[in-house]
From Swiss-Prot:
Transmembrane feature ranges: 231-251
Keyword RNA-binding: no
Self-association and partners: Interacts (via SH3 domain) with PEX14 (via SH3-binding motif); forming the PEX13-PEX14 docking complex.
Database matches in InterPro entries: Peroxin-13_N, Pex13, SH3-like_dom_sf, SH3_domain
Role of this protein: Component of the PEX13-PEX14 docking complex, a translocon channel that specifically mediates the import of peroxisomal cargo proteins bound to PEX5 receptor. The PEX13-PEX14 docking complex forms a large import pore which can be opened to a diameter of about 9 nm. Mechanistically, PEX5 receptor along with cargo proteins associates with the PEX14 subunit of the PEX13-PEX14 docking complex in the cytosol, leading to the insertion of the receptor into the organelle membrane with the concomitant translocation of the cargo into the peroxisome matrix.
Protein name: Peroxisomal membrane protein PEX13
GO cellular component: peroxisomal importomer complex; peroxisomal membrane
Impact upon substituting residue 286 to A: No effect on activity
Family (UniProt): Belongs to the peroxin-13 family.
Length: 380
């Protein structure tokens, strides 16, 4: 083959770099979210006071490993900031103020430091009470705002209903005016608008006659109470037919997706119907460990593979990374200089097989043709 030292990898196409950068971007996004949320809670309006107090306190170690030290309330207002390392520690009475010259020395553990350390728990308790009261005040404020907004919403709705009432009244007033005009026209023309008892009695007698005639003859509404089977048949068809059609549809979709999945897995989505007689095969010259196992194919020295494509998927140009398929069915890209193409040796078609057939044909053509007289002589 060649020497054992593997050559340098060629430059990757844009499709491989895009897949690798997307995975790295996902990882960096997770790191950014973690660091951003961690630092944002501590560096807010109150600095490390409420940030580290409620962030690291209730989140990681309030009374555990942090206690009132760096994790719980230590890094808050009265821990590492005011009475710890800030004001009365190394800054106030420690090294800066009265540390080196008077009382506390390098460590800041004099009278002021001991008082600050002793009163730290009390101030932290007061701080937690103030925080709880502040939270309760925020809840009350939110409740008040919700009640206020809902109250004014109801007022605006009542106002809109009053406008609707006015609009409906004006619309119904038109019909009132029309009825009033009809009455005036009836009075002018002598039409009686009021129904007299005699007229009502006549109307009632006519209705009774119509009802008796319909009961005797059957009438036009004879089959009104007969039950119809159409709603029942439609209901049964919907109950039985809809699940059947849905099952057929799901089976068809599953079969289609399975065929597409097999087609993509076999590499047919990019290469179409591959002809095995026209495929090129290659042998790995060196071991290759891919950086992105989803896009690249791992190679072992001497491994055989089939070359599916030598072009880039996006631009269809000649690429330095070839798409190959291994014996176990895995598909991926490999560098072109890590493999060698296996040349096929075509067997020549032997011409000796055609010579006997040609000789037999020539002999048959040279044989004399027997006519009818010679055939009669041969019979006698």
């Amino acid at each position: 083959m060649s020497d054992s030292s593997a050559p340098d990898l060629p430059s990757k196409p844009s499709s491989l770099n895009a897949g690798q950068s997307s995975s790295l971007q996902t990882t960096n996004t997770g790191i950014g979210m973690g660091s951003g949320m961690g630092s944002g809670m501590g560096m807010g309006t109150y600095g490390n006071s409420y940030g580290s107090s409620y962030g690291g306190g209730y989140g990681s170690s309030m009374y555990g490993s942090g206690g009132y030290g760096m994790g719980g309330y230590g890094s808050s207002m009265y821990g590492g900031s005011r009475y710890g390392m800030g004001s009365y520690g190394m800054g106030g009475y420690g090294m800066g103020g009265y540390g080196m010259g008077m009382n506390t020395g390098m460590n800041g553990m004099g009278m002021a430091g001991s008082l600050a350390q002793g009163s730290e728990a009390t101030f932290q308790l007061i701080e937690s009470i103030i925080g709880a009261v502040g939270g309760f005040a925020q809840v009350l404020e939110a409740t008040y705002m919700a009640t206020h907004s809902s109250f004014f919403t109801m007022i605006s709705m009542a106002d809109q209903l009053s406008h609707l009432k006015t609009a409906l009244g004006s619309m119904l007033g038109i019909y009132t005016v029309i009825n009033w005009l009809k009455r005036i026209m009836g009075k002018l023309m002598g039409v009686k608008n009021k129904l007299t008892p005699d007229e009502f009695r006549k109307f009632q007698e006519k209705q009774m006659k119509k009802l008796s005639n319909s009961n005797n003859t059957g009438g036009p509404n004879k089959n009104t109470n007969k039950l119809s089977l159409k709603p029942l048949l439609l209901f049964l068809a919907a109950v039985v037919g809809f699940p059947y059609l849905l099952k057929k549809l799901i089976a068809h979709l599953a079969e289609t997706s399975q065929m597409n999945g097999n087609f993509i897995t076999s590499g047919g989505s990019l290469q179409g119907n591959l002809d095995p007689t026209k495929l090129e095969f290659a042998r790995a010259l060196y071991d290759f460990n891919p950086e992105n196992e989803e896009m690249e194919l791992k190679l072992a020295r001497g491994e055989l593979m089939a070359i599916l494509s030598k072009t880039e998927p996006n631009s269809n140009q000649e690429s330095t990374w070839w798409k190959c398929r291994s014996r176990d069915g895995k598909v991926g890209f490999v560098p072109y200089n890590y493999v060698e193409i296996i040349e096929r040796h075509q067997r020549p078609v032997p011409e000796a097989q055609e010579e006997p057939a040609a000789a037999v044909l020539a002999e048959r053509q040279q044989q004399p043709i027997i006519d009818s007289t010679e055939f009669q002589k041969m019979k006698t």
